[in-house]
């Protein structure tokens, strides 16, 4: 990983900074933080327009609202100008911002802590640093956002209790003023939320979620948002408390939104000792037997070896051994033989595990370390850990320990059934992707439901939408929204390419979507034997054989529209790939200058006239 950085520090004098006024390097983003009668507040503007109207910020610890009756004093500033590499959408990322420091004193107790803000040319972020010893309880935060009323907001909806657990909602939109009443699951929404104002795109998110509980957003009347946490009564932390960054991304267009580096730049650089050598972090594609069942050969030694053979013949780097291997009485013998066979064929293996079988924190997660030792010993390259189902402090601590312990054993990690990414891929580059997205497995679940209904002589209910019986194929509108919503935050293991179960989409749509989300580990859902043997998909297979999973450059074409049309161009070396998905016919023009004039050959894949 290459990282270069330049930091300039200087004292911030009240007479020279205009009080608490702050600005980004170009001056287009400006913010102000101030202490009012009831607490601490901030505002954010973009090119002179109010983006976040006066909103509260603050934290409550041990039932003390440290933001009330607080004094705020400027303490310093620095300019940050760094470049670094994060595996994914482009070769070089940048962290260029102005950081402002404020000392905060809670007058009734005399307790002193710090507020940090950072202003980028495409956003604003803040966090608190609270020194202390022993165990304290974070009861909540006063964090608030008040975006413009005249906005449309995109959010992830799932009409079941799973909505706030797995981040697997369908992306839809409503007016900002109705967000608090639109969902039958209540006013609490998952991050991110994306607002389309008359002049820009505004995304609310968080970054650097470590040693803390993940934040959700409670929508309120008047288009306001408030912080919400899994632990309604609070969560305990020891020692100094550092909150995640509370982030507002501000983008002039969808290309700027998709290419923002704010989330990763707010995360620490990788540990130079833990990641001194990163040659073992190898992105690539993976075949996967779970989605299709591989014609009855699922979790048989012969069937999984055939998947490995198919991967080798197609030049695909990995195969994923999913849920089911542990049910075999000879599970470790099975895994050992399969891993050895995969190694002989030049294919790496990922292996699945339920998180509850790893989550005992006793003896510094001895249970976890033992499992990782075992899979590393037989030659496994990565682990897919599933069903964390939440973002409370318990899940977040587990995830961090998993990434650290896996890195010590040179193992890649693919978290599933998990929360949104917050930039972990920079600090722990062995996180090769993560779920936290509504992906194509829903088409499989729907097919299972419909088959069960038919077998029982019943008609599938089109409105059925509960865990285990979700009759909800992924619609094209969801896919046309994902790159500009959940996809902005980081890699998403959507597991694309479902030719045989496309729902209401087409084969070309399924192939195109494989290029639209970042995922350095690109797990392909389709039956490996259909993929390699069905002549109908031969043109698609030609693309899949050489499809990169990391890119040098990503460009969103200007005709793109959230939920209707997503067209993205990506470059790897001297080759450009352009893919699009849509919900209705649309004309797309490739901007002049995007493709070099010297380009001499293009391959076009589209749906046949008969579908």
PLM regions and their residue ranges:
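Bacterial Sec-dependent signal peptides at the C-terminal "C-region" and cleavage site
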Residues: 12-23
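Glycine-rich, aromatic-lined ligand/substrate-binding cores of catalytic
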Residues: 499-572
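Conserved, mostly hydrophobic/aromatic
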Residues: 128, 311, 386, 413, ...
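Aromatic- and carboxylate-enriched substrate-binding clefts and catalytic-loop regions
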Residues: 324-506
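N-terminal accessory beta-strand-rich subdomains and adjacent acidic, glycine-rich linkers
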Residues: 21-269
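Sec-dependent N-terminal signal peptides
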Residues: 4-14
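Carbohydrate-binding surface patches
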Residues: 561-598
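An acidic-aromatic substrate-binding cleft motif
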Residues: 238-318
